[in-house]
């Protein structure tokens, strides 16, 4: 899949890089002991450090450091055993210190990579430039008072990982796949919950365009704080088309920060884009360099779970799944665990088909996740056993599954209570076939005359007469014997 924009003077390709701000899973903030609980009353989780009271000194949260290293290892990135915190100087009402504690020249994590699973089954690689730790700012609220803006400092000082990609993406779909994969990895690791709707994962989107076939990077614009995968993809498309129009009309794209308006489907200028020197970075004199040894990194490495790519490869090898099915199943750790329970001792492909197409489809329709599924992995496995043992046929299995989604009942009990066992008595099926043929002599003659497509119609009628319980293979054999000899 290639995303190109045709213009009057050239065909343009899009160049995209993402800066993802991921809130670290930790009960306390990066440099203070204040809680990070979401949804608490305004200014109820603010320490003297968070409010930048004079004389208050930051103390590093060791868990946040470990979480950053875990994430770096999950991204197959270089871990820098010595990094430095720096002050990023700028003024804003919700930044009480007048600077943000971040990392600049020496981040905690260096280059890595993320492998994307695309919808067409292909894989693509996106480079990671760096990951650094920094503190979040507070929140300005403009809708709480008719004439004043208010400040909530609950978020001030919360630990963030800023994960900066290389400009390796060439289409909106790749950016979407990158965000989904990054979120999946961090959820497996337990380092970020990835809830974009709560602001715990936000993306700054860097977009530029260039004529196809050229290699120079043109001026980019940054779209700030986009809070959903869908909006990121829409923002890239809108901004790319805007830039193409500017270049095609003889103008020049200015380096600036922009905002995306989802309602209008367009980006608008926010301010001219700052350069690094505008922030006057310098090492924070209140914090020593962050140093750890190889033993610490290895200890963290040994604690890593099986990650999505490794799990996907195992599912392909152990269960014979297609790369696409395996990638769908491993997006969420809970989904993968559910599938493994269903597939244990059973045909992996059949289990994957039922989990992906039947269960996931029904749950999406009901607005639920696997954790809230009324159908347990054990009961779905029992349903597949009934199907394999030919106690029920495929059509009845779907009916039983619908009842299970509504009630959560055991499939064995449903089949017995409702008398849904498959009819495998040859004489009973023959009687039903004879009755349908006798009632439709003209159609029977048409089949004998060569219109074999009508056999499907007869199958449907017999199934209707037996309430869907006739064994399909036996039914087909009997029909063919009686109508085609």
Swiss-Prot record:
<dbReference type="InterPro" id="IPR003789">
    <property type="entry name" value="Asn/Gln_tRNA_amidoTrase-B-like"/>
</dbReference>
<dbReference type="InterPro" id="IPR042114">
    <property type="entry name" value="GatB_C_1"/>
</dbReference>
<keyword id="KW-0547">Nucleotide-binding</keyword>
<keyword id="KW-0067">ATP-binding</keyword>
<dbReference type="GO" id="GO:0006412">
    <property type="term" value="P:translation"/>
</dbReference>
<dbReference type="InterPro" id="IPR006075">
    <property type="entry name" value="Asn/Gln-tRNA_Trfase_suB/E_cat"/>
</dbReference>
<dbReference type="GO" id="GO:0050566">
    <property type="term" value="F:asparaginyl-tRNA synthase (glutamine-hydrolyzing) activity"/>
</dbReference>
<keyword id="KW-0436">Ligase</keyword>
<comment type="similarity">
    <text>Belongs to the GatB/GatE family. GatB subfamily.</text>
</comment>
<dbReference type="GO" id="GO:0050567">
    <property type="term" value="F:glutaminyl-tRNA synthase (glutamine-hydrolyzing) activity"/>
</dbReference>
<dbReference type="Pfam" id="PF02637">
    <property type="entry name" value="GatB_Yqey"/>
</dbReference>
<dbReference type="InterPro" id="IPR004413">
    <property type="entry name" value="GatB"/>
</dbReference>
<dbReference type="InterPro" id="IPR017958">
    <property type="entry name" value="Gln-tRNA_amidoTrfase_suB_CS"/>
</dbReference>
<dbReference type="InterPro" id="IPR023168">
    <property type="entry name" value="GatB_Yqey_C_2"/>
</dbReference>
<comment type="subunit">
    <text>Heterotrimer of A, B and C subunits.</text>
</comment>
<dbReference type="Pfam" id="PF02934">
    <property type="entry name" value="GatB_N"/>
</dbReference>
<dbReference type="GO" id="GO:0070681">
    <property type="term" value="P:glutaminyl-tRNAGln biosynthesis via transamidation"/>
</dbReference>
<protein>
    <recommendedName>
        <fullName>Aspartyl/glutamyl-tRNA(Asn/Gln) amidotransferase subunit B</fullName>
        <ecNumber>6.3.5.-</ecNumber>
    </recommendedName>
</protein>
<comment type="function">
    <text>Allows the formation of correctly charged Asn-tRNA(Asn) or Gln-tRNA(Gln) through the transamidation of misacylated Asp-tRNA(Asn) or Glu-tRNA(Gln) in organisms which lack either or both of asparaginyl-tRNA or glutaminyl-tRNA synthetases. The reaction takes place in the presence of glutamine and ATP through an activated phospho-Asp-tRNA(Asn) or phospho-Glu-tRNA(Gln).</text>
</comment>
<dbReference type="GO" id="GO:0005524">
    <property type="term" value="F:ATP binding"/>
</dbReference>
<keyword id="KW-0648">Protein biosynthesis</keyword>
<dbReference type="InterPro" id="IPR017959">
    <property type="entry name" value="Asn/Gln-tRNA_amidoTrfase_suB/E"/>
</dbReference>
<dbReference type="InterPro" id="IPR014746">
    <property type="entry name" value="Gln_synth/guanido_kin_cat_dom"/>
</dbReference>
<dbReference type="InterPro" id="IPR018027">
    <property type="entry name" value="Asn/Gln_amidotransferase"/>
</dbReference>
């Amino acid at each position: 899949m290639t995303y190109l924009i045709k213009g009057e003077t050239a065909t343009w390709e899009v160049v995209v890089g993402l800066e993802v701000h991921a809130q670290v899973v930790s009960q306390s903030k990066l440099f203070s002991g204040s809680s990070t609980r979401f949804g608490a009353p305004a200014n109820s989780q603010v320490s003297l450090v968070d409010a930048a009271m004079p004389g208050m000194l930051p103390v590093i949260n060791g868990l946040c450091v470990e979480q950053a290293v875990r994430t770096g290892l999950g991204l197959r990135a270089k871990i820098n055993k010595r990094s430095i915190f720096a002050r990023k100087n700028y003024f804003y009402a919700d930044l009480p210190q007048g600077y943000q504690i971040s990392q600049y020249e020496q981040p905690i994590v260096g280059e890595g990579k993320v492998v994307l699973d695309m919808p067409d089954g292909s894989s693509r690689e996106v480079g990671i430039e760096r990951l650094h730790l920094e503190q979040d700012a507070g929140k300005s609220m403009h809708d709480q008072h008719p004439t004043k803006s208010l400040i909530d400092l609950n978020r001030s000082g919360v630990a963030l990982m800023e994960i900066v990609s290389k400009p390796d993406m060439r289409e909106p779909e790749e950016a979407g796949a990158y965000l989904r994969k990054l979120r999946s990895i961090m959820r497996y690791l337990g380092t970020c919950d990835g809830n974009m709707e709560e602001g715990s994962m936000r993306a700054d989107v860097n977009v530029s365009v260039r004529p196809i076939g050229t290699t120079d990077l043109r001026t980019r614009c940054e779209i700030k704080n986009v809070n959903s995968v869908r909006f990121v993809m829409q923002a890239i498309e809108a901004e790319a088309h805007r830039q193409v129009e500017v270049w095609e009309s003889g103008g020049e794209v200015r380096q600036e920060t922009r905002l995306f308006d989802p309602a209008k489907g367009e980006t608008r200028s926010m301010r001219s884009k700052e350069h690094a020197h505008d922030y006057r970075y310098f090492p924070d004199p209140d914090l020593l360099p962050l140093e750890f040894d190889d033993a610490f990194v290895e200890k963290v490495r040994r604690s890593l779970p099986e990650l999505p790519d490794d799990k996907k490869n195992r599912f392909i090898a152990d269960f014979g799944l297609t790369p696409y099915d395996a990638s769908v199943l491993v997006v969420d750790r809970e989904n993968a665990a559910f599938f493994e329970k269903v597939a244990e001792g059973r045909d992996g492909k059949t289990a994957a088909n039922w989990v992906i197409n039947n269960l996931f489809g029904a749950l999406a329709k009901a607005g639920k996740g696997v954790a809230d599924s009324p159908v347990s992995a054990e009961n779905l496995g029992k349903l597949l056993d009934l199907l394999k043992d030919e106690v029920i046929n495929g059509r009845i299995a779907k009916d039983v599954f619908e009842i299970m989604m509504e009630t959560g009942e055991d499939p064995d009990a449903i089949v017995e209570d409702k008398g849904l066992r498959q009819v495998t008595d040859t004489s009973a099926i023959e009687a039903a076939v004879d009755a349908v043929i006798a009632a439709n002599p003209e159609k029977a003659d048409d089949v004998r005359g060569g219109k074999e497509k009508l056999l499907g119609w007869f199958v449907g009628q017999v199934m209707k007469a037996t309430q869907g319980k006739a064994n399909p293979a036996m039914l087909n054999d009997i029909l063919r014997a009686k109508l085609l000899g």
